């Protein structure tokens, strides 16, 4: 019971001249830094104690926006993991945010055929410019449509048509025990398009982050730094959450405690 735990935003940071993975840490019980990882090229960021950094990414023209369409649950049985991957991988993108002397690296999900992308707000927090990398390795500079730190969501726009949008499902239909899969870019672009699977282990989980409460889905699907902004997908191939947090203990191993925004 004396174990201190922290919530990690699933964000990878790359310093120019050398790759370094890190995550912003939000203490669940006391503010501390995690010990350095065994590999000296990897290190954590310090605990966040200040207000969110201002994002200075160029904004899309006023009035630009899109509507997120929630599709009904398809008829028929559950899809195989192979089917879920094939149905969704084209909709998963990499997010590169220029930030001071480095970059933040995360994941995004295509919302529309004409270039709208959803990701986590903390992925682009403090960035001066953001690029989106598609699965075919094309790179587009993104404009910021909107961002909300408390919900930890942001919408970007790239000048590209013909994208493959994900199908979004109704997260209120989820039940504890439902099978889910997560697709994202753990530890950055070298491992982009990684899929893990698990179950929904809790619904409407209240998680205190930086003094306010987020109501999240809890999952056993493995999530790591770089998965921020990625897709949590139900067994019918629909995106039902945007992955953003995991829990980690200081003095014992915690596994299978990942979170997603419903």
Model-identified regions with their sequence ranges:
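Terminal peptide-recognition signature
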Residues: 90-95, 108, 115-119, 142, ...
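Active-site loop architecture of trypsin-fold serine endopeptidases
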Residues: 23, 99-103, 127-130, 163, ...
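Active-site substrate-binding loop(s) of clan PA
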Residues: 83-84, 143-145, 162-189, 261
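Conserved positions in beta-strands of structured domains
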Residues: 96, 109-111, 124, 143-146, ...
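A conserved glycine-rich beta-strand in the N-terminal activation segment of trypsin-fold
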Residues: 75-83, 96-116, 131, 138-141, ...
């Amino acid at each position: 019971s004396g174990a201190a735990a922290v919530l990690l935003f699933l964000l990878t940071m790359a310093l120019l001249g050398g790759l370094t993975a890190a995550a912003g840490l939000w203490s669940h019980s006391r503010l501390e830094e995690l010990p350095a990882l065994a590999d000296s090229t990897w290190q954590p960021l310090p605990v966040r104690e200040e207000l969110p950094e201002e994002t200075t990414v160029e904004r899309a023209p006023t009035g630009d926006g899109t509507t997120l369409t929630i599709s009904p649950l398809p008829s028929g049985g559950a899809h195989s993991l192979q089917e879920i991957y094939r149905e969704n991988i084209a909709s998963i993108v990499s997010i590169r945010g220029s930030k001071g002397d480095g970059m933040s690296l995360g994941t995004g999900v295509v919302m529309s055929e004409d270039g709208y992308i959803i990701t986590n707000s903390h992925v682009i927090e403090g960035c001066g410019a953001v690029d989106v990398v598609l699965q075919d390795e094309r790179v587009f500079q993104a404009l910021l449509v909107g961002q909300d730190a408390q919900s930890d969501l942001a919408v970007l726009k790239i000048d590209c048509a013909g994208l493959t949008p994900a199908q979004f499902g109704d997260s209120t239909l989820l039940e504890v025990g439902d099978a889910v899969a997560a697709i994202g870019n753990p530890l950055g672009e070298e491992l982009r398009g990684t899929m893990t699977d698990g179950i929904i282990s809790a619904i409407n989980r209240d998680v205190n982050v930086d003094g306010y409460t987020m109501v999240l889905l809890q999952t056993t699907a493995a999530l790591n730094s770089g998965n921020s902004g990625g897709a949590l997908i139900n067994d019918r191939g629909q995106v039902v959450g945007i992955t953003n947090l995991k829990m980690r203990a200081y003095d014992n191993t915690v596994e299978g405690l990942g979170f997603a925004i419903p």
